[in-house]
Amino acid sequence: MSDSESSNITSTNTITAIVLASGLGTRFGGQKLSHEIVINHNPPFALGVISALNVKPFVDHVICIVQPEDKALKQQFKFHGFTTVDNLDFEQGLSSSIKAGIRFCQDNYKNPSNNHYMICLADMPYIEADTYKAVTKQFKARIKIHANTIIRPVLTDNKKAGHPVIFSNKFETELLNLSGDDGGKPIVKQHGVDSVIVDDAGVLADIDRKTDIRL
């Protein structure tokens, strides 16, 4: 089920950002993704919406995966013009959101075989614009040479891999076979990735608790 202003979108070698916003957020103590925060002296936005706003300039489409009954968050996404997709299986973990997003693309894009997937976590609002730009640029260069491409950022300081992660559509079947809360980790472990070195601590900074919010 989806709430979309556009269907049958024409896709030609496109990237769709799938913003995973249907998590339970139990450690936060309240409606985490609807909680408003301020970044860089900008007006306050719902935490879950910021990732979608940040990635939007660098991809072709953005879809936001939500719990069916999370009306407050849906309203926030709609206000900013984003498509929302209901994840009926949200209690089954992160992988269920990825699968809901891919199925939406399969059902609504005229050429889904030309569409690739950037997996974004809605609780990671501190990723910088330059990081989104770098990973998309690297992906577009690599996909011309290697159909089986996975791109993710790696932090300069400690060489830890972060988000977002872009999967070419050659991994679509494997993504649809994921289960549990590990997301695409099993695919990354099996196939490896091309890394983009970034000086951006935001690629590792998810918000699990209120104390994770930068003041």
Model-identified regions with their sequence ranges:
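Acidic helix N-cap motif at the loop->helix transition within catalytic regions
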Residues: 71-78
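Conserved alpha/beta core of the MobA/IspD/sugar-nucleotide pyrophosphorylase nucleotidyltransferase superfamily
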Residues: 3-13, 17, 173, 177-215
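Short beta-strand segments
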Residues: 18-22, 65, 120-121, 152-155, ...
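Conserved donor nucleotide-binding strand/loop of the catalytic core
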Residues: 81-92
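Short, structured coil segments at secondary-structure junctions
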Residues: 58, 78-81, 189-191
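N-terminal glycine-rich phosphate-binding loop and ensuing alpha1 helix
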Residues: 12-71
